């Protein structure tokens, strides 16, 4: 199917079959579409509403074209904490901080991420502020995971085919299909994920996409306060994919043994602010930031198999911060990226 035919279909509110979506998305990702066609397609898909089958097909193309990171067969518990972003709440870099706590707890992490698109600080922005080198080869990223238990998969380096859609995405300035399929396309093939989404209506569908793609254990989350993380200020809706089955439920901060706090206690003005909060939490200060990081790192420890349930995952995450293990893992990561870049 060519793009013109696809545009005609979606403007008539008709869904694309998996084969049709695969063909269209491959055309976009290999430079066969004009900027106007790409922009029209993305807006048309958003207005129509992306289906599970369409998202799965798009993610499969992204995975196929990605620059892979091969960590070997010993890392079957590999976890990613990358979310969609786009919640516009301006909180600290929770998923990035959670990655280092999780790695300190013995679970290998392939943290997929980028610079800020909608938030005040993206994963890449934060890690550069820490002094890390992000522009590493795939082999160097894999080696970083082997040495430190965590590596950063900088999206522009691993999804170079995305360059064809960068211009239209920036000019559109709104959430598109790419926000949804990016976190579904981990270049290291992580089959375990904590994945925050920007709207509650996407919790179940994204879990269904990962079910179709063969993931092992995933929590897709969105909080009632709008946060695309597990929140300390409101209940969080979760779709859990495990053993091929999806279960939906809601957890409160109290359910997880968390101290509730308003989101303004974890709101940042920029990257420096975020880093200061994370360093304070990693030094053992029982601030709201520690609770928010523990909530999400605890979930990642759970999907990685290091905790039997969410509540005990949260307890373990706190221990890893108060003991200094998370801070040490971050320091080792920064030093290792510099060494591998030489």
Curated annotation (Swiss-Prot):
GO biological process: L-tryptophan biosynthetic process
Cofactor note text: Binds 2 magnesium ions per monomer.
Domain of life of the native organism: Bacteria
GO terms assigned for molecular function: anthranilate phosphoribosyltransferase activity; magnesium ion binding
Pfam families cross-referenced by the UniProt entry: Glycos_trans_3N, Glycos_transf_3
Pathway: Amino-acid biosynthesis; L-tryptophan biosynthesis; L-tryptophan from chorismate: step 2/5
Record-linked HAMAP family: TrpD
Keyword terms of this UniProt record: Amino-acid biosynthesis, Aromatic amino acid biosynthesis, Glycosyltransferase, Magnesium, Metal-binding, Transferase, Tryptophan biosynthesis
Top-level EC class: transferase
Positions annotated to bind anthranilate 1: 83, 114
Binding site for Mg(2+) 1: 95, 229
Binding annotation for anthranilate 2: 169
Ligand binding (5-phospho-alpha-D-ribose 1-diphosphate): 83, 86-87, 91, 93-96, 111-119, 123
Name of the protein described by the UniProt record: Anthranilate phosphoribosyltransferase
């Amino acid at each position: 199917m060519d793009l013109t035919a696809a545009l005609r279909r979606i403007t008539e509110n008709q869904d694309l079959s998996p084969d049709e979506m695969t063909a269209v998305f491959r055309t976009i990702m290999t430079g066969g579409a004009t900027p106007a066609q790409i922009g029209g397609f993305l807006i048309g898909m958003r207005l129509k509403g992306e289906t599970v089958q369409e998202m799965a097909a798009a993610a499969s193309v992204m995975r196929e074209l990605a620059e892979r990171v091969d960590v070997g067969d010993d890392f079957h518990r590999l976890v990613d904490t990358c979310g969609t972003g786009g919640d516009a709440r301006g909180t600290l870099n929770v998923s990035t901080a959670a990655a280092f706590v999780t790695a300190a707890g013995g679970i290998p992490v392939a943290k997929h991420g980028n610079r800020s698109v909608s938030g005040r600080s993206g994963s890449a922005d934060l890690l550069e502020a820490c002094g890390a080198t992000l522009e590493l080869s795939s082999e160097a990223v894999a080696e970083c995971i082997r040495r430190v238990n965590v590596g950063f998969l900088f999206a522009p380096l691993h999804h170079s085919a995305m360059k064809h859609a960068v211009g239209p995405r920036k000019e559109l300035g709104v959430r598109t299909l790419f926000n949804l399929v990016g976190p579904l396309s981990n270049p290291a093939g992580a089959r375990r994920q904590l994945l925050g989404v920007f709207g509650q209506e996407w919790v179940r569908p994204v879990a269904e996409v990962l079910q179709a793609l063969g993931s092992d254990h995933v929590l897709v989350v969105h909080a009632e306060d709008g946060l695309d993380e597990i929140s300390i200020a409101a209940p969080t809706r979760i779709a859990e994919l495990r053993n091929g089955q999806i279960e939906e439920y809601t957890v409160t901060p109290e359910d997880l043994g968390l101290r509730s706090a308003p989101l303004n206690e974890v709101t940042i003005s920029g990257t420096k602010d975020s880093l200061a909060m994370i360093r304070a939490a990693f030094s053992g200060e029982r601030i709201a930031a520690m609770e928010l990081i523990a909530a999400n790192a605890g979930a990642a420890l759970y999907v990685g198999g290091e905790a039997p349930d969410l509540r005990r995952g949260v307890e373990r995450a706190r221990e890893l911060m108060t003991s200094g293990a998370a801070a040490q893992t971050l320091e080792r990561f920064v030093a290792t990226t510099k060494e591998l870049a030489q």
